[in-house]
Amino acid sequence: MADPRALVIGGTGPTGPFVVEGLHERGFDVTILHGGQHEYEFAVPNVRHIHEDPHFQEPLERGIGSQTFDLVVAQYGRLRIIAEVFKGRTERLVAVGGATGIFAPDTDPRWGATGKPALFADSSTVYVREPGEDGANKIGFRMVEAMEALFENHTAGAYSATYIGYPVNYGPRSPGPYDWSVIRRVLDGRRSIVVADGGIKIDSRVFTANAAAAVLLAIDEPEIAAGKRYSVADDNAFTMRQRIEFIASHLGHEFEFVDMPYELAWPCYPLWRHVRGHRLTLSTLIRDELDYRDPVAPDAAMATTVDWLLANRPAPDGELERQIGDPFDYEREDQLIARWRDAREALGTVESPLPVQGHQYRHPKAPGEAWKPGPS
C-alpha cells in the first residue's frame, strides 16, 4: 500500500521544516510547493519540490497539474485561491493564517460599550467585516474572506478543513524579526533604549517550533479538528521591557531605559509594531481539544531566537531590516532623549497629594473594630 501523499504549500520558512519533517515521520510522502526564493536542507529524504507561486491561481494549478493529495497544509500563499484550487483535489486541507488580525478593530461597535477587550476568547466571531477607510483593515478583511471560503468548502464536502491562526512568529528564519531592533542596539554599543509607557505593552507571540507542533496535532486528530478554527500562542506572554531585558542579559549587556509617553517614543515603534495597546490572543480551544502544550519553554525559545539572529545577522538596510522598519537613527534618538531629559528637568519635582491607599477589607485588631484607612 502506497504511503499517504501530503503537499505542504510553503515548507521552507520558519515553521515549514518542522511540519515537513513531522509529516515524513508520520509516514507521509511529502511534496512542497513554494516560490523557490528560499531553500532548506531537510533532515529527511525524498522531499520533492515544486517551484510555483501560490499567490496566483494559474501558477498553482500549473504546479500541481492533475495530482491529488490526501492532505494539503497551506502555510504560504493566498488562502482564498488555495481553498478554491484544491476543491476535489484533497481529502483534508489544514490552513495557517492569522490569530489576531482577523478580529474587528477597537472602534467596532460590535464589541459593546466597553470596547474591544485586551484579551478575549479565541472562540470570538467579531471579525473584520469591511476594509475600512483608506483600506486600513483590508488585510484583515481579506483574511476573513479566505477563512470563510475555506469553511464554506468544508461544509459543502469539498474537503475537511481546519484553520490554525498564529499571532506574530519568532524564531529562526522568521520574517520581520522584531527582536533585531534590540539585538542590533546591543551590538552597536547603545547604552540607552527608549521605551513607551514603562514598557508594559504585551503581545502574544508563538515560537516557530511551538506553532508547527500545533499544526501536527491537528493533522493527528482529523475527526476532532474537522471544521475548527484554532488559535495557538505561547502560554506565557511578556512585557516589552521583559523581552528587552532578557535579550540584553543574554548578550551580557545592560540598558538604561528611557521611559516616555508613547506619543513621543518613536524609536520603539518598530518593536511595538506601531500599536500602543496590547495584542493578545488565547489558545484555549486547541489546548482543550487537542491537548496542545508548548514544547519549547519561553527562555529556551527566546535564547534560540537571539542566537540564530546573531549567527545570521540581517544586512543593514536589507530586506529584513526594511520589514522591521527600524532606521537605527541613533543621532535623532539621542536628540529625543536629550530633549526629554531637559523637559523632565524643567518640570521639576512633582509632589503627590494622595493619601495612603487603604486595603478594601477590615483587618481588625480587636473584635468588632471598624474598617480604617492605612496599611493592615
Residue ranges and their predicted role:
Residues 4-26:
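N-terminal Rossmann NAD(P)H-binding glycine-rich loop of SDR-like oxidoreductase domains
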Residues 218-278, 283, 303-304, 314-376:
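Mid/C-terminal beta-alpha module of Rossmann-like enzyme folds, strongest
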Residues 15, 211, 215, 232, ...:
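Non-catalytic, hydrophobic alpha-helical segments
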Residues 33-37:
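N-terminal Rossmann-fold cofactor-binding loop
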